[in-house]
């Protein structure tokens, strides 16, 4: 038997060699079976001898076995087809279209009298298509890392599910295709051979040589009889500049860009009175470090009369309908807020009764320039008490980074603050009460709900714990279309009733009524607008954040009555977690936000935690715990822009180094982002001096900075778990992550102003902007 086994094994090797090499067929004396041998798919050794399985020769398909003796002619090995119908598929061969792979069915062959016909789906062809698609998605053969293995496996499973393959077949296909994705085929090998061919090396060397400039003395020695050589030598002796190779600045310089003017006019409202002035509009500036982002176009709106008028029309007085026509904001059903009375009583009980803090303490709630402003307002209150005029609005166009790539000409946002004197009198009640009410909302929902004041690690773990509370979790993110604009008088009255119940103070009640009807003046350098509006949330009010959270959490609690769910909230940004079989009920109930006067915009349901987006962040597992990570497709460009003025190169370096410091505090150990922020800190930290003072400036205050204040992550090694989770969340493959990190780790940035006509070149843009196949 050992000898028989050895002979059969040798025959198997010979027959497989004959499949690929005609010379082997001739050597084995098989000229009559060349057609058969070219199409032999697989040979399998069984106890009865060598079995050559599934020849694809035209007109002949089936299983062939060596029913003859070993010493007989090799021609006896290829006997007539058996009556069995064993079908094997060649996974090495490239097949036709994907439709052929998924729909092609073959019939069992053999003796049709003995074996009934049956149809077998060719999973092998489909698996080969999956291999090819995976290599295209992962840009060739992935590196053999654990993160890539998990990413490829996940991608293959989703590839099969999108094509409605049953689970039992998915497992077979994935197990078959996975190792082949990591195994280079002939084309993969040929690419490497071409890159390292003699011809390729010669061309690269020639290109490098063409870009060199010989030293002047070398040039003189090689060409002593030319005037050009002696001219160079003379210039060097006179300490004049020598010839240099040309170089192009590709990344890293500083740019100053002017503010934008809207090109859309929406007319005026009867409640507006416009007063143009002869002065030109004041042009704002936005500053940018080139070479760091993915080419998104960020800008800032000027505080001009043109922008102010459109901002008031579209963000205060009117909303757009489905036909892009302006109409008044929808009003709530009369009496609808009365249905929230039970929720109000519960929140008041949980928050408890409170008294105001002394007004002298209010400036201490702020730092820097804001503390100074409130101290001056406090001093004036000693001379004269607060009045209705102090509640009037002083409106201007907000100076913020606008993504003009996402929307070419959006309506400018306006800030509508009241006098600091009014804010002190209201704030002495509501500022300390704010956190008590947030914790009451948490208690009402049965866990952390209003996610303010947490760092990114705490936020990520809250998201993970909330996700784990359900058997099969589904999450839907939703927010309100221009929430502030849709806050009606009825909504404000219900919100104020919660505060009044907690304090039972006539002074507070009187101050809050001044928010129901609002008068204001919007000022720009080239004109001003006087206007009046009923209701609406004013963005500068002390209770803006508190009131929005209170309304969003309370209305959602009412709408989801009877459904087991959990909410996380930050103002009008909400995510609801629940059992997947409740998705239809949840989506239907979200439509009833319109009953309260709000237009709810619900996102698509998500069934993977990394796909859940909250405040433009997604939870990513870094190998130790969950952390909220900002969307790199937006943040990598947004963080390279500044609305804070860069007076000179050192001022720019301070700002950029501070961004790097803050970024590492919230993104240490996160793929791509850690290298991005390290690049800023490495390039500009040595030039900036004491850049941490820049973080204390009121102009540096932002959601990004507030997140970083509690962050203590710092630089650390990126784990394979983090790479896989980052891939699931944002679609960048582990190899793409490493390519981006290599780009940022080696990027040298210039702290110089850009040359005239400079166009930013981004060699990493194709990776950052690539939107992969849905996972």
Swiss-Prot record:
Enzyme class: transferase
Single annotated GO MF: RNA-directed RNA polymerase activity
Key words of the record: Nucleotide-binding, Nucleotidyltransferase, RNA suppression of termination, RNA-directed RNA polymerase, Transferase, Viral RNA replication
Annotated GO biological process: viral RNA genome replication
Record-linked InterPro entries: DNA/RNA_pol_sf, Rev_trsase/Diguanyl_cyclase, RNA-dir_pol_PSvirus, RNA_pol_HCV
The EC number(s) this enzyme carries: 2.7.7.48
Pfam family, one: RdRP_3
UniProt cross-references to PROSITE patterns, sorted A to Z: RDRP_SSRNA_POS
Described purpose of this protein according to its UniProt entry: RNA-dependent RNA polymerase that plays an essential role in the virus replication.
Note: Readthrough of the terminator UAG occurs at position 251.
Protein name in the entry: RNA-directed RNA polymerase
Reaction catalysed by this enzyme: RNA(n) + a ribonucleoside 5'-triphosphate = RNA(n+1) + diphosphate
Effect on the protein of changing residue 56 to S: In strain: Infectious clone UK
CDD domains, sorted: Betacarmovirus_RdRp
Effect of residue 345 to K: In strain: Infectious clone UK
UniProt source species: Turnip crinkle virus (TCV)
Domain RdRp catalytic intervals: 473-586
